[in-house]
Structure formats: C-alpha cells, structure tokens
Amino acid sequence: MTLLRSVLLAIVAASSLPAAANSCYVTAETSGAVPPPVVTEKCFEYQGMDDDAIDWVCQDNEAVKNSRREIRDSCPSGHFGICTAAITPETLANERATGSQATDTPGPTTVPREARILTYHYESTDRAQARIDCESAGGEWSQ
C-alpha cells in the first residue's frame, strides 16, 4: 500500500511541474536614420526536439541592443507567414542558421533528421524580404 501511495504521489508531483517552454518570441529594431530602422517581430518553435531545447537560444541577451527574447508556451496567432526549415546543430545556437546556410559545417549528430524549426512572422518592415530570406536559406514559406 505504501509503494502504491508513493507512486501515485510521484505521478501527481511530476504532473504539477510547470511545462517546459517550447517557443521563443523575438522583437527587434535596428537603429539609425539611414537606412531607415528595420522592425521585426517573430516567434519560433522547434518540432521533433525536446521541449527545453529552445531555452538556451531564447535567452534574452543584454549585449544585443534593441532586441528582446521571451520564452512562451506557444507562438500566438496573427502571423503573416511561416518559414519551416530543417534544424541543424547551428540552429540550436542561432535560429537564423537553417537549411542550406548551415550544411557546410559538420556538426554533432545529436539533432534528429526530422527536426524542424517553424518561424512565425508577425511584423516586418519588408514582408517580401522575409519570404526571400526563408527560401534562400533552404526553408519553405507558407501562410
């Protein structure tokens, strides 16, 4: 009876832990008058990876001015486009290093072959450029 009670208590305790974050919301704005400032607002998430894999790349870094990263449970609705690309070891450190941009450097094989990064775009000074950047890096654009 005591063993059963301990097992049930362990299950309840584990299920009451906060869920691991699995998305990262990023806002950024360049400064300066020429060229005009570039504003971006996006959220990315990993598929086929552990839920906590995004925690390191989503750390808000004070050294990067005019940029803010926030860990969230999920990306919100309201995007104008989604870029889907393969995750590489480099993507785990820099979410923009995806697909063909990250295939030249051999890395550890700890990333599952089917792992993907989905980047939801909400705000961009040049929406067409967001699609061009996605596709030229080996990603697939959808709306």
Over which residues does each language-model region extend?
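Bacterial N-terminal signal peptides that target proteins for export
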Residues: 1-8
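N-terminal signal peptide c-region/cleavage motif recognized by signal peptidases
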Residues: 16-18
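Mitochondrial intermembrane space
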Residues: 20-143
